[in-house]
Amino acid sequence: MKASILTKLEMLVERYEEVQHLLGDPGVIGDQDKFRALSKEYSQLEEVTKCFTAYKQAQEDLVAAEEMAKEDDAEMREMAQEEIKAAKVAIEDLAAELQILLLPKDPNDDRNCFLEIRAGAGGDEAGIFAGDLFRMYSKFAEKRGWRIEVMSANEAEHGGYKEMIAKVNGDGAYGFLKFESGGHRVQRVPATESQGRVHTSACTVAIMPEIPEAEIPEIKASDLKIDTFRSSGAGGQHVNTTDSAIRITHLPTGTVVECQDERSQHKNKAKAMAVLAARIVQAEEAKRAAEVSDTRRNLLGSGDRSDRIRTYNYPQGRVSDHRINLTIYRLSEVMEGDLQSLIDPVIQEHQADQLAALAENN
C-alpha cells in the first residue's frame, strides 16, 4: 500500500481516538447537536479503524511467519509457509477493503429521500406496473426498517398510479436507492389481454435526497406560481370538498410539483415545497456532474424516460440491469422487495469506477 494512503489512515485513527475522547466530555454530552454529529463521525471512523487495525495485524503476522520459515525444523517451516500464504491473502483483501472505505463519500448517502414513480408508455398496464414498483420499494424499505410516507398520488383508473411521490425515511435511504433512478421496462401478459400476447410497458423512477432546511436554496416567492384545487381519487372522483390540494410551479425551471395527500392545504404546501427544493438541487447537481464527467460513464440514472436501466421479464422470470449487463432469474423475489441482489452489484461497479478514476488522477 502507498505511503500516502498509510499516512492518511494513521491520521484517521488519530481522529477516531480524539472523537472517542470527546464523546466522553460532559460539555459535548450536554450539546445534543454536537454529540449527534460526533457520534455519526465516530461510527464512520470506526469501520476504517477496525479494518486498518486488522491490516496491520496481518502485516505483523506475515513478518512473524517469514521469521518462522527460517527455522531448522521442517515441520515448523511447512507451518510457516501456510501462515505466510494466509497472511498475504488477508493483507490483499484488507487493502482492497480499505481502498473502498477511503473513497469519497456522497454527503447525501445517509439522508432520507424522495421516490418518484411515473407511468410511461403502455397505457393502463404502465399504471399497474407503477403500482407494482411502489409495492416492491415499500417491501424493500420494510426489510431495512425504513418508513415510507406517500406525499402525493395520482391513481390510475385501472389500478396503480399515473404518478406518485413518496418520502423514504431511514438511515442510508438515498445511498441505497439512488441507483434506481431511470427507466424501468416490464414485459408481461396484461390481465386484460385475451390473446395471451406479451406487452411492453415502461415507468420512470427518480430518487432525490431530502435537503436539510439549512441547505435549501433561497426560492423567491415571485418565482413560484401556486394553484389550489380539490384533491381527487382515481377516475376524477373527489375525495375532498375543500381546495386543499396544491400545485406549485417553479417558473425559472418549469418544475411542477403537486401534493394532495393531506386534508390541510398548509401541510400539502409544506410537502410540495420540500419536493420542489429536492428537485431543484438535484437538477443543479446533475448539471454540474455532467460538465465534470462528460466522458465517464455514470451509473446514476437521470430519471429520464430514455435512460432505460432495467427490464422485468415475467414470462422468463428474469430481471436485467442494462448498465452492468447483469441478469438474474429471481423476478418474484425481486418484486417482493429482495432488491439487494440488484443494488449491491451496481454499488460495487460504481466503487470500481471510482477507484479507476482515482488511479488515473494519481
UniProtKB/Swiss-Prot annotation:
PROSITE patterns: RF_PROK_I. It is found in: Cytoplasm. InterPro entries: PCRF, Pep_chain_release_fac_I, Pep_chain_release_fac_I_sf, Prokaryotic/Mito_RF, RF-1. GO terms for molecular function: translation release factor activity, codon specific. It comes from the Bacteria. GO terms for cellular component: cytoplasm. Keywords: Cytoplasm, Methylation, Protein biosynthesis. Pfam families: PCRF, RF-1. Its main location: cytoplasm. Methylated by PrmC. Methylation increases the termination efficiency of RF1. The modification N5-methylglutamine is found at residue 237. Peptide chain release factor 1 directs the termination of translation in response to the peptide chain termination codons UAG and UAA. Belongs to the prokaryotic/mitochondrial release factor family. This is Peptide chain release factor 1.
